Amino acid sequence: MNPIRRRKIEAEAVRTVAMMILSGKVKDPRVHMVSVHRAEISEDGKNMKVFVTAICTDKKKIKVLSGLNSASGLFQATLSGKLGLRITPKMHFLWDEEYIQSLDESLRLTRKPTNTD
């Protein structure tokens, strides 16, 4: 797949999922207060990983991911309609550990005491 086309699909997927969650089109009560960070489409264009986070416990995290994965068909249909895709990638929602780690690192650095005598 063309890299420019791939980035366009990934960006539109992030935008579409975020807007559908914010606008309330996803009726699943497990899906709320979710941040969509990035998407990665496979080389063949058949699968897409969508990375998300939310402020919740580990137990609730599983429910959030389950709710998103159960609504993936709705996201896929909307994305296909917006981009006119012949093959719509199957969306798989994953917790964005990389984003969480970068936040933790930023917080750690800002809280680091400085010695100014």
From Swiss-Prot:
InterPro entries named among the record's database cross-references: KH_dom-like_a/b, RbfA, RbfA_dom_sf, Ribosome-bd_factorA_CS
Alphabetically ordered keywords of this record: Cytoplasm, Ribosome biogenesis
Protein name: Ribosome-binding factor A
Function (record text): One of several proteins that assist in the late maturation steps of the functional core of the 30S ribosomal subunit. Associates with free 30S ribosomal subunits (but not with 30S subunits that are part of 70S ribosomes or polysomes). Required for efficient processing of 16S rRNA. May interact with the 5'-terminal helix region of 16S rRNA.
Family under the similarity heading: Belongs to the RbfA family.
GO BP, one annotated term: maturation of SSU-rRNA
Subcellular location: Cytoplasm
Provenance organism: Leptospira interrogans serogroup Icterohaemorrhagiae serovar copenhageni (strain Fiocruz L1-130)
GO cellular-component term (any): cytosol
Assembly description: Monomer. Binds 30S ribosomal subunits, but not 50S ribosomal subunits or 70S ribosomes.
Gene3D superfamilies: 3.30.300.20
Name of the coding gene: rbfA
GO MF annotation: an example: ribosomal small subunit binding
